[in-house]
Each structure stands twice: as C-alpha cells, then as structure tokens.
C-alpha cells in the first residue's frame, strides 16, 4: 500500500542553492522540484511536502544563447497604451528576485497549493542571507 504524506508529519528542510555560474533554466527546474517535494519518497500531489529553498548570488546566473538581449517581459496595468516591456538583462540587474519568482511560478501548480509553495522560495542577490539559523540546524545533524 502506498503511503501518503499528512500535513502534520512533514518535516521541512532548508536548502541553500548557489546560483553562481549555473544555467538559469536548470536551476529553476531544481528549485521547482524541491519546492513541490518531488525529491521525497512520500511525495503526495495534494499536500505541500516541499522544502524551503534559499537562492544566493541570484544575479550571477548564466543564460544560454542571446536570451539576455532578446527575451522580454511584459506588464500591463489595464489602461490603453500602458504595455511596458523589460529585457531579461534589465530584470536581472534591477529585480532578480522577481525574475526567479516568475520562472518558478510557471512550473508550480496554479492553485492555492502553488501559492503556498512559492512562499517558501527566498531569493537574494549576494551570498548573505538572514536564514543562517535555519540552514545551520540541518548541518549540525
């Protein structure tokens, strides 16, 4: 009989990923798997059994091809003529946190469960982050 995970039985770990010199798409896939909990043997699709993920050095990630110049992100407020676009390079320089959240959100379920999963993603520009207490507990075991 297959074991299903229950909410009160889940123990969440804190995983720190260094984005320096990693390919963006492969890193985002790894983050999505950790947030969903698909790396665990008791993965249950209707329960949030994923870990907390802390990404450091977010703006030092690599992109393949000409994506930095060619890829664009669009925003629209709802008013006529208010469509604005930013290139991937601009997004990476100004708001790398938003870039990671947009990419990971596309790989998670579009439900309340997906919203709960994306809240466990913490992204920081450099290698300093305020979650050293949570991550050091895992290293002490």
UniProtKB/Swiss-Prot annotation:
Gene Ontology biological process: negative regulation of translation; translation
Family per record: Belongs to the universal ribosomal protein uL13 family.
Residues making up the signal peptide according to the UniProt record: none
Gene: rplM
Keywords: Ribonucleoprotein, Ribosomal protein
GO terms for cellular component: cytosolic large ribosomal subunit
Subunit-structure text: Part of the 50S ribosomal subunit.
Protein name: Large ribosomal subunit protein uL13
GO MF: mRNA binding; structural constituent of ribosome
Family annotation (Pfam families): Ribosomal_L13
Function: This protein is one of the early assembly proteins of the 50S ribosomal subunit, although it is not seen to bind rRNA by itself. It is important during the early stages of 50S assembly.
């Amino acid at each position: 009989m297959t074991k299903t995970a229950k909410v009160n039985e889940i123990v969440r770990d804190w995983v720190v990923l260094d984005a320096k010199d990693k390919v963006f798409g492969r890193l985002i896939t790894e983050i999505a798997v950790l947030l969903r909990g698909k790396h665990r043997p008791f993965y249950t699709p209707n329960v949030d059994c994923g870990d907390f993920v802390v990404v450091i050095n977010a703006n030092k990630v690599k992109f393949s091809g000409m994506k930095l110049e060619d890829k664009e992100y669009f925003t629209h407020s709802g008013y006529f003529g208010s469509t604005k676009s930013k290139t991937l390079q601009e997004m990476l320089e100004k708001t790398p946190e938003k870039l990671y959240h947009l990419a990971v959100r596309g790989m998670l379920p579009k439900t309340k469960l997906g919203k709960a999963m994306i809240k466990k993603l913490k992204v920081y520009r450099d290698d300093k982050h305020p979650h050293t207490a949570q991550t050091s507990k895992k290293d002490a075991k």
